[in-house]
């Protein structure tokens, strides 16, 4: 955008993290056409650089006209259009205690009728509307703020630098080139008998491969940011709670030889290989008349459906029997699963049936023998063995629009295959381009934009 979108009101909010209630410095951000004048009303300063753009100067916050100072601050000014939002922006750097920062914000709001508290994500929304950032960059800022590990933060920062936009525009340009050739023929009513269908299908196949790779990466990098939920499933006394304690490096679950000890779900959050994981210990599955235990078993099956990954544990002493097979048949086919044979220290592994060994990890949870292999297997099956190859983070909104575009391109294949009118090709390509444009924010309704930015924190 070349022009700056102006709004009648000026917004203000605490822009720094204050979740623990105190810190060395807190920042109050003010944006809008009245930001400088509103701050002048509450700031006393003798600096010769006062209120110049891209200057930081010293001052005091004044509570009333009696010159009662309540805090000593640094003030930075960024005048339109050279600011994050594209508007005039002032940032007040005050001391970080929750009491004082709220006091400064209250004084600012009460002294200026044209200044109001910002809505969640409103600073970023104004930056987007003023063309300072595209929608993927705005979402990446929120992603970075909420990153739960360093890899997630790295992926978010690549989005801030415009990597998502680059990949989407690359695909979009490919489709625009195809659309131009087709529409030129439609507009001039040229004969399509000499149209190179093979070349077109080859080009579209390349575009679809790019989209499919992004979709595949989107599924994997969701694990990086949101974590992998892993349910420990199996019969009673096979070592589920012991495995939970082993992974947690502390006793989180009670372990006894009495069947049915675990009657409720126990969850712990860990970070392994810089990937967040939620480990879920469930009640042992068996036939029982005990009501509380039966409730726990129902929860076990519920967690099977809710989890990303299943570790099915059985005892090598007992072997993998019909009861185990029956339980595994209850696990949805699409679920990622690893079968773990526990208590290898109690048997001679040479005597294990070769069919039982297939796709099974042998482990002694008691002796911590096999933990590394188990973790490596989880990471490999989740497609995270080479996370360095994943260089952008795509969220569910991006994924939905990419999938819609892919559907449009598949429809063009059907149009050619069934020799349908050529103008239908143009329609599908236009729809595909529109779905890609929604990702960067070029084709979105105001209502949808409000919904996206409402998920941001206040102050960003």
Swiss-Prot record:
Binding-site list for (6S)-5-formyl-5,6,7,8-tetrahydrofolate: 29, 91, 132, 460
Location relative to the cell: Cytoplasm
Residues annotated to bind GTP: 237-242, 256-262, 281-284
Chain sites annotated for binding Mg(2+): 241, 262
GO cellular component annotations of the record: cytosol
Required cofactor names: K(+)
InterPro entries: G_TrmE, GTP-bd, GTP-bd_TrmE_N, GTPase_MnmE, MnmE_dom2, MnmE_helical, P-loop_NTPase, Small_GTP-bd
Domain of life of the source: Bacteria
One BP annotation, GO: tRNA methylation
Residues that, per the record, bind K(+): 237, 256, 258, 261
Entry's EC annotation: 3.6.-.-
Cofactor binding summary note: Binds 1 potassium ion per subunit.
Subunit-structure text: Homodimer. Heterotetramer of two MnmE and two MnmG subunits.
HAMAP family for this protein: GTPase_MnmE
Main function: Exhibits a very high intrinsic GTPase hydrolysis rate. Involved in the addition of a carboxymethylaminomethyl (cmnm) group at the wobble position (U34) of certain tRNAs, forming tRNA-cmnm(5)s(2)U34.
Protein name: tRNA modification GTPase MnmE
Source taxonomy: Bacteria, Bacillati, Cyanobacteriota, Cyanophyceae, Synechococcales
Gene: mnmE
